[in-house]
């Protein structure tokens, strides 16, 4: 067991030593990478950004500001032109895709949701905002009076329940019921 413990300790010590060496190598690589990035950044800035020369007089500073503003305006115009081109090309792509689907006969159907919409809103959506159409669907409906059913009339006519019982009691009350039914 003594040899085995020494061996395990040697293995763990060797592992720790290898880990520390690997960490040192990684740290030096990171430092080299950082210095390389910094030098690339300096090279890029020196190539693309001319050194700033600030003149001494006020008129020269104003002239420099005007030049810088002109450059900014030109860059903004280019940016706007590029955005317009991108929008135009994306629109053309969408149109071409739609034509492609039409030619193939396969339509890409978007998922539709059920929307509650009044008739006026539907007409406005179909015809556009230029046409003002008010459609009252209830105006053309026929008005119907509710006819009283016999049961409702009986209930209204009954009034006091005692009178109802007296009328229906005996043979004459039964006779009246049969006469009214036929």
UniProtKB/Swiss-Prot annotation:
Span list, region Disordered: 29-53
Gene Ontology terms, MF aspect: actin binding; troponin T binding
UniProt modified residues of type N-acetylglycine: 2
Superkingdom: Eukaryota
GO terms of biological process kind: cardiac muscle contraction; positive regulation of DNA-templated transcription; relaxation of skeletal muscle; skeletal muscle contraction
Keyword NADP: no
Entry-annotated residues carrying Phosphothreonine: 12
Basic and acidic residues bias spans: 29-41
Sequence segments annotated as region (Involved in binding TNC): 2-48
GO CC terms of this entry: nucleus; troponin complex
Biological role: Troponin I is the inhibitory subunit of troponin, the thin filament regulatory complex which confers calcium-sensitivity to striated muscle actomyosin ATPase activity.
Subunit structure: Binds to actin and tropomyosin.
Protein name: Troponin I, fast skeletal muscle
Naturally occurring in which organism (per UniProt): Rattus norvegicus
Gene assigned in the entry: Tnni2
